[in-house]
C-alpha cells in the first residue's frame, strides 16, 4: 500500500533528521508530503469523475500540474539516488531504497 509506504518513509526521514547533523532533509520531506497529498487527491478525483479522459480534455491546468509533478518526482529520484550513493548508514540506505521504489511506483501510477 503506497499510502502507508509514504507515511513510513516520511517517519523514517524525520528520524534521520534528528539523528544526524547531515544536510537538511526538510526539502525532500516536504516534497514527498506534497506528492503524497497530490496522489491521494488524484485518486479521489478519478473515482469521483469516473472518466479520467474527460477530466484531462476539460482541464488544461490539470495537465500542467501533472507535468509539474513529474518534474518534482524526477528531482526527488535524483536527490534520493545521490543520497544513496553518499551514505554508509544502513538505516538511511534502506529508507532511501524504499523511497526510490515508492517514487518509481508513483511515477508509473500517475503515468497510467
Curated annotation (Swiss-Prot):
<dbReference type="Pfam" id="PF00601">
    <property type="entry name" value="Flu_NS2"/>
</dbReference>
<keyword id="KW-0946">Virion</keyword>
<dbReference type="GO" id="GO:0039675">
    <property type="term" value="P:exit of virus from host cell nucleus through nuclear pore"/>
</dbReference>
<dbReference type="GO" id="GO:0044423">
    <property type="term" value="C:virion component"/>
</dbReference>
<comment type="subunit">
    <text>Binds M1 protein. May interact with human nucleoporin RAB/HRB and exportin XPO1/CRM1.</text>
</comment>
<dbReference type="GO" id="GO:0042025">
    <property type="term" value="C:host cell nucleus"/>
</dbReference>
<protein>
    <recommendedName>
        <fullName>Nuclear export protein</fullName>
    </recommendedName>
</protein>
<comment type="function">
    <text>Mediates the nuclear export of encapsidated genomic RNAs (ribonucleoproteins, RNPs). Acts as an adapter between viral RNPs complexes and the nuclear export machinery of the cell. Possesses no intrinsic RNA-binding activity, but includes a C-terminal M1-binding domain. This domain is believed to allow recognition of RNPs to which the M1 protein is bound.</text>
</comment>
<keyword id="KW-0945">Host-virus interaction</keyword>
<feature type="short sequence motif" description="Nuclear export signal">
    <location>
        <begin position="9"/>
        <end position="18"/>
    </location>
</feature>
<keyword id="KW-0813">Transport</keyword>
<keyword id="KW-1048">Host nucleus</keyword>
<feature type="short sequence motif" description="Nuclear export signal">
    <location>
        <begin position="82"/>
        <end position="91"/>
    </location>
</feature>
<dbReference type="InterPro" id="IPR000968">
    <property type="entry name" value="Flu_NS2"/>
</dbReference>
<comment type="similarity">
    <text>Belongs to the influenza viruses NEP family.</text>
</comment>
Amino acid at each position: 500500500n503506497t499510502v502507508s509506504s509514504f507515511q513510513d518513509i516520511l517517519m523514517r526521514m524525520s528520524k534521520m533528521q534528528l539523528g544526524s547533523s547531515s544536510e537538511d532533509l526538510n526539502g525532500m520531506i516536504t516534497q514527498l508530503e506534497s506528492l503524497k497529498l497530490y496522489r491521494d487527491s488524484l485518486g479521489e478525483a478519478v473515482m469521483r469523475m469516473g472518466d479520467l479522459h474527460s477530466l484531462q480534455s476539460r482541464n488544461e491546468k490539470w495537465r500542467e500540474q501533472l507535468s509539474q509533478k513529474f518534474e518534482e518526482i524526477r528531482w526527488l529520484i535524483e536527490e534520493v539516488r545521490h543520497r544513496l550513493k553518499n551514505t554508509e548508514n544502513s538505516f538511511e540506505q534502506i529508507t532511501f531504497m524504499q523511497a526510490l521504489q515508492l517514487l518509481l511506483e508513483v511515477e508509473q501510477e500517475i503515468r497510467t
